[in-house]
Amino acid sequence: MNIFALFETRVREALESLTRSGRLPEGLDLSRVVVEPPRDASHGDLATNAALVLAKEAKQNPKALGEALAEELRTDPRIVEASVAGPGFINLRLAPEVFQDVIRAALSEGENFGRGQMPGGPVNIEYVSANPTGPMHVGHGRGAVFGDALANLLAAAGRPVTREYYINDAGAQVDVLARSAYLRYREALGETITIPEGLYPGDYLKPVGMRLAETHGRALLDQPEHEWLPQVRRFAIDAMMAMIREDLAAIGIRHDVFFSEATLQGENGGKVAELLDALRQKGLVYEGRLPPPKGQLPDDWEDREQTLFRSSQFGDDVDRALLKSDGSFTYFASDIAYHRDKWLRGANELIDVLGADHGGYVKRMQAAVKAVSDGQARLDVKLCQLVRLLRAGEPVKMSKRAGEFVTLRDVIDEVGRDAIRFMMLYRKNDATLDFDLAKVVEQSKDNPVFYVQYGHARRFSVLRQAREALPGEDFSPAALLADADLSVLTDPGEIEMMRLIAQYPRVLESAAAAHEPHRIAFYLYETASSLHSFWNKGKDLPQLRIVNPTDRNSTRARLALVEALGGVLASGLAVLGVSAPNEMR
């Protein structure tokens, strides 16, 4: 039950009534009419901008139009007050029965409460896509958690979602990996090695070298590089991807598809060659020279005639090269082919979750997706800013020793999955995140993950108290739904909790539409806080205690309220991929 959608429909019906009576012209554009929470909760339960956004088109004074619309809305028994504020906003105060119906809906729908049928087709979300050249660091973790939570969020809103990881296994960096692993292989066979500059020095490749020695013995030593390199490269990539998958599993990150870059460039150029043919058929490829970039020239810029894609026709700043001087495909050409492949697999909305250093990538890829899909698909690129590791407010040194750094697994082992996931989502993705290893394990209000999980655990602690105080009573959601008298919930704290529960479907929907899972984290903190505040009031005022052995009526009503609120906390935590414990240990 979404009261915002419900009363938006009611506002539109009222506008239609005004049109039928001749007080509004026909054919008004209602697409910008919304119903949302008022900026100040003391003004009412809902607010609509209808009079403001329609006044100009209707050639009416917004305040006068607001008064006419408010008069029409007052005829609805579910609306106890409709008042015009400021330049024409209409604030609505709802009858208590509306919120009582919300609690009943939350109890009856359980984990499906708030989950919607968001319009739009299949979504493909690509996230993590860390190079398979070493362990994941904390920055990778932020993109991983953000992408996974966004996938959960869109699925909860009703969109079909494919979760994808792009394995960068065709670039020069995997040859560097292979040569580094080969040195560790020689070391495993007893040779003393020196790792030259430009290769990966980390100890994480020692086990790879040992497994190579176990698998191949000394056979690779007798082979020239062009023979051993592809074998070691595949072996090392598989070993790195196994390590990355283990790290992802440790924080609950999952993918449906692991897509290999190498598969794009198969026989005769594979899917990248197909892409160039498709772009040529559209007249979007030409031979030309690019002007020199402004400022300092990048190392890879060449003043020569090149094979170019007309990306500037689709919103990019300049056209882009598709072939290198040696005739091989550019990284950009491979990226376009990959995104075209996602679209051909059925996704009409593509989301890439990348590090903040990929800002220059956004316009060119959005232009490319528009071109290859004839405007049928859109690309949203979500950039995740840096993570600063702190301990009790002091910066943590990221490097442990030469070639080694603080890995994501190090942080998982220290603070656990839930703390990482919640805190990575407690800031907007494009804001730098300070992650304090000491604060995220505190048991206090200042630690959001503890505070929200404690709110959910309280749902079960009051249930245990009720069973002890009123033995033999049935406190299941079905029983509470059947006979709890919700009309006794009149305290401001109870009303606040009901309002917050009623907001959950809208929060879920708006967070999904904006691709912003942090909104769920903020909402959960506010909702858990409302329960904790009411609980604390009951410690001082016995008549407000949730469980009152001498007042069965209020006990059952408050347990119904807490059960509904706890269900919303569990649902929101599931979207974030954070556990909802029944008790805190």
From Swiss-Prot:
Localization per record: Cytoplasm
GO molecular function, one term: ATP binding
Keyword annotations of the record: Aminoacyl-tRNA synthetase, ATP-binding, Cytoplasm, Ligase, Nucleotide-binding, Protein biosynthesis
Top enzyme category: ligase
Reaction catalyzed: tRNA(Arg) + L-arginine + ATP = L-arginyl-tRNA(Arg) + AMP + diphosphate
Record motif 'HIGH' region, residues: 130-140
PROSITE patterns, per database record: AA_TRNA_LIGASE_I
Gene3D superfamilies: Arginyl tRNA synthetase N-terminal domain (3.30.1360.70), HUPs (3.40.50.620), Isoleucyl-tRNA Synthetase, Domain 1 (1.10.730.10)
EC number per UniProt: 6.1.1.19
GO terms (BP aspect): arginyl-tRNA aminoacylation
Cell membrane among keywords: no
GO cellular component: cytoplasm
Transmembrane segments: none
Classification via Pfam families: Arg_tRNA_synt_N, DALR_1, tRNA-synt_1d
Coiled coil found in the keyword field: no
InterPro entries noted in UniProt: aa-tRNA-synth_I_CS, Arg-tRNA-ligase, Arg-tRNA-synth_N, Arg-tRNA-synth_N_sf, ArgRS_core, DALR_anticod-bd, Rossmann-like_a/b/a_fold, tRNAsynth_Ia_anticodon-bd
Taxonomic superkingdom: Bacteria
Record text on subunit structure and interactions: Monomer.
HAMAP family for the chain: Arg_tRNA_synth (MF_00123)
The family this protein is said to belong to: Belongs to the class-I aminoacyl-tRNA synthetase family.
Protein name, UniProt field: Arginine--tRNA ligase
Annotated source species: Methylorubrum extorquens (strain CM4 / NCIMB 13688) (Methylobacterium extorquens)
